[in-house]
Amino acid sequence: MANVESFDLDHTKVQAPYVRLAGVKTTPRGDQISKYDLRLLQPNRGAIEPAALHTLEHLLAGYLRDHLQNVVDVSPMGCRTGLYLAVIGEPDEEGVLQAFEAALRDTATHDRPIPGVSELECGNYRDHDLQAARQYARDALTQGLKVQKTILLQR
């Protein structure tokens, strides 16, 4: 099986909440696509409830695009401790951190309907929790986000 970057990360040594450059891929045409680990919870110490994570995905998909250019995708992690961000190019981690903080501030105060929540727009439109999503955003902001360097497993 192909190597998976996140399986080489020492999850016991990172300190959430954080932003981490998880990798950069070069397309056949030479474009760069950067993947960022946007971690809200400490690995193996908790998990975001699925409805809250689904709402975070919807809100951050829009709000991150408001604060950062060339966003390709925002996707929840299977472990439910954060999300991945894919961006064209190689924005510096500090710039991604600032955009993530701004998007979390927007999420923490979001008081309108959740975007993309209808049977036509979403594959599981009933599974959302705005209040919990707002609380996760507030908690991460209160704890203070930072840039986390990749710490590889010693094998």
UniProtKB/Swiss-Prot annotation:
Biological process per Gene Ontology, one example term: quorum sensing
The keyword Cytoplasm is assigned to this record: no
Key words of the record: Autoinducer synthesis, Iron, Lyase, Metal-binding, Quorum sensing
The reaction(s) this protein catalyses: S-(5-deoxy-D-ribos-5-yl)-L-homocysteine = (S)-4,5-dihydroxypentane-2,3-dione + L-homocysteine
Subunit structure, as described in the record: Homodimer.
UniProt similarity note: Belongs to the LuxS family.
Record protein name field: S-ribosylhomocysteine lyase
Species this chain originates from: Deinococcus geothermalis (strain DSM 11300 / CIP 105573 / AG-3a)
Encoding gene per record: luxS
